[in-house]
């Protein structure tokens, strides 16, 4: 395994085969590179963190035994998706984004396609927050790809159709822009260039209109800023205040006991959770 990993990153190769981050394995650098299913289960159920749950939402088999992969996913599913309304995970997602913002402050914060305001991370965090919160009870939300998850959230009336369309358009744009930045400059970077000439090159690759270098660069930045402004605003609005979530969590247990409780929970308490624009309809679906 280590030999394959080293070969994939070998300097003699013209390009990277795969970029693999071994620190993402159980226990990070101190953990075994290869783990048994039992070891994985013990680790995730005992020490697994929210960011690992988020990462595993997107996990898939890329090589080796598909049956082993299926067994792993069946084993790990209860770790990713909890039966209870998981408001603690929402708090941790907010904390992670706060730490990212703090680390970027004054350093590559502007024009960071992935980690900056309204960037790719905020799109994914918005989607994954809904999946972690509600996926334990609704298996249809256990979708690996982000666009598919957005579609399901819209079908469940958890995202409005308008928000879904804007979010999808923004995500596709940002992913395409990220890919073109990396292809153009041959680097694993998420930063927009800080000069007009390179921005104009990117604008052409993004099929932007413009009759001059300046107009191309300006048009690219205008579209980028419109998308990130929408995503950043939605991300901020989608997270309810802590007190509202705690109130809903308190009522959650009561809502389990009877059909009457479910009616009360739907109409009164879910309305307090800003993650759900149409709580009553979403709950019935």
Annotate each language-model stretch with its function.
Residues 7-285:
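A nucleotide- and high-energy phosphate-metabolite-utilizing enzyme signature
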């Amino acid at each position: 395994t280590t030999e394959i990993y080293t070969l994939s990153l070998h300097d003699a190769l013209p390009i990277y085969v795969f970029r693999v981050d071994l620190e993402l394995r159980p226990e990070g650098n101190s953990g075994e590179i290869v783990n048994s299913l039992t070891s994985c289960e013990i680790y995730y159920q005992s020490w697994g963190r929210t960011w690992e749950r988020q990462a595993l939402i997107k996990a898939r088999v890329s090589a080796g035994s598909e049956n082993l992969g299926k067994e792993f996913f069946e084993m790990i599913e209860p770790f990713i998706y909890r039966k209870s309304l998981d408001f603690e995970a929402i708090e941790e997602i907010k904390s992670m984004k706060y730490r990212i913002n703090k680390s970027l402050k004054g350093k590559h914060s502007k024009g960071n396609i992935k980690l900056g305001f309204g960037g790719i991370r905020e799109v994914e965090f918005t989607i994954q927050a809904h999946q972690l919160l509600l996926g334990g009870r609704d298996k249809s939300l256990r979708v690996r790809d982000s666009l598919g998850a957005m579609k399901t959230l819209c079908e469940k009336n958890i995202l409005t159709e308008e928000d879904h369309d804007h979010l999808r358009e923004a995500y596709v744009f940002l992913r395409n822009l990220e890919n073109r930045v990396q292809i153009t400059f041959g680097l694993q970077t998420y930063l927009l260039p800080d000069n007009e000439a390179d921005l104009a090159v990117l604008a052409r690759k993004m099929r932007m209109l413009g009759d001059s270098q300046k107009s191309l660069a300006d048009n690219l930045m205008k579209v980028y800023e419109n998308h990130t402004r929408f995503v950043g605003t939605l991300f901020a609005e989608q997270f309810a205040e802590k007190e509202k979530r705690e109130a809903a969590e308190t009522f959650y247990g009561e809502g389990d006991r009877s059909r009457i409780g479910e009616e009360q929970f739907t109409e009164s308490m879910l309305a307090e959770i800003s993650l759900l624009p149409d709580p009553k309809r979403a709950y019935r679906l």
